[in-house]
Amino acid sequence: MGDEYMDDDEDYGFEYEDDSGSEPDVDMENQYYTAKGLRSDGKLDEAIKSFEKVLELEGEKGEWGFKALKQMIKITFGQNRLEKMLEYYRQLLTYIKSAVTKNYSEKSINAILDYISTSRQMDLLQHFYETTLDALKDAKNERLWFKTNTKLGKLFFDLHEFTKLEKIVKQLKVSCKNEQGEEDQRKGTQLLEIYALEIQMYTEQKNNKALKWVYELATQAIHTKSAIPHPLILGTIRECGGKMHLRDGRFLDAHTDFFEAFKNYDESGSPRRTTCLKYLVLANMLIKSDINPFDSQEAKPFKNEPEIVAMTQMVQAYQDNDIQAFEQIMAAHQDSIMADPFIREHTEELMNNIRTQVLLRLIRPYTNVRISYLSQKLKVSQKEVIHLLVDAILDDGLEAKINEESGMIEMPKNKKKMMVTSLVVPNAGDQGTTKSDSKPGTSSEPSTTTSVTSSILQGPPATSSCHQELSMDGLRVWAERIDSIQSNIGTRIKF
């Protein structure tokens, strides 16, 4: 709303008697515009004195005095004369009962509260909100009372004063109940504002049990006919819902909520849209999706923003399972990525996902692998390697046994899936021998499957001790036998 109601000079719904020709009104109007001219010229102290003369000319409280006080509040706020500003504000609040219309006073006071909300002096803001609420006890302006209380509640949230916030929420909920003591569904929009406050509080407290309950209520309220929520409120609810889902491991639901939050923030022009887009990318990585989130029409315009570029680089490194590149990107973008507590909360999970994929790739060709070798390759402690292996066994179905005494990872010899640990060399004089893979940190033992393979591959007995030379026909025979093995053990072998 900004200066629209802080600096206006038009008639906003006033009903005047036919007194346009009265001399006092003309004098006050002229004095008001003289003061505005001084303010425009930067002569602020002179402007304040000139605005005060408007109040002196005013016999009965009316529009010109109300407008003059708004201007003086604005000037003294800019000068950081906060005590004087509060004095003018208290004086202005005496006008809201009868001097100006209810609608105009409501919009003007909302504009003033929005205007001073840029101050980082939380005690000043609290004083302003509480002063407004005191003045509204007799004014009977429910909408202004509700809006002021929600602003005060947001302030308590920013200050992490959750006990005070809970008290505000209770008062707001009472105002939304009908005569039977039930929530008045006609006040769906107000209920959503209350839920948004609660949801933010429970998200910050990581109280998922309470958060789920309020989130469900908010989701129901969104679909009521009486609810016409501001996109900013919807964005807040969806963002917190996404955080809740992500912490619960429901990555797909989180992805959906973050995308909805991003769209709502974008519609309202909120800077939170960029933050939520980063959360969307985070969820996209955790669901291990190959779909680029920036392919959507809504997200595409933000693709080249510096903070988002860093996230897209992270996605590429993540999909490539490139641990070194991933860590370098996080280190290079501490301010835009790691400064966010929520993203930081989940980066270790992303790193573990990458390490797990690299781990599986490292052990795939072998039946036995040393834990120390994996530790060296992954650049983590042996304890962390064991932790990753346990997760891979439980979550990814890895068929392996951890032998901590020998420091080895052992693959079961009776597993159905064939592990290509050695290459069988058909030899007439030395049937069934194997040529072991001798990569560092690994060892190879013929499993049951390998033994079966050796016996099938040994071929017809040789007539001499020399190695057989295979003709093209002989190779075809071997190929047919290999196909037979593959159909029996359910895997493909590449020679």
Swiss-Prot record:
Subcellular location: Cytoplasm; Nucleus
GO cellular component: COP9 signalosome; cytoplasm; nucleus
UniProt KW Cytoplasm keyword: yes
Span of the signal peptide: none
GO biological process, one term: cell cycle switching
Compositionally biased region (Polar residues): 430-441
SUBUNIT field: Component of the CSN complex, probably composed of csn-1, csn-2, csn-3, csn-4, csn-5, csn-6 and csn-7. Within the complex it probably interacts directly with csn-1, csn-3 and csn-4.
Function: Essential component of the COP9 signalosome complex (CSN), a complex involved in various cellular and developmental processes. The CSN complex is an essential regulator of the ubiquitin (Ubl) conjugation pathway by mediating the deneddylation of the cullin subunits of the SCF-type E3 ligase complexes, leading to decrease the Ubl ligase activity of SCF. The CSN complex plays an essential role in embryogenesis and oogenesis and is required to regulate microtubule stability in the early embryo.
Protein name as annotated: COP9 signalosome complex subunit 2
Organism: Caenorhabditis elegans
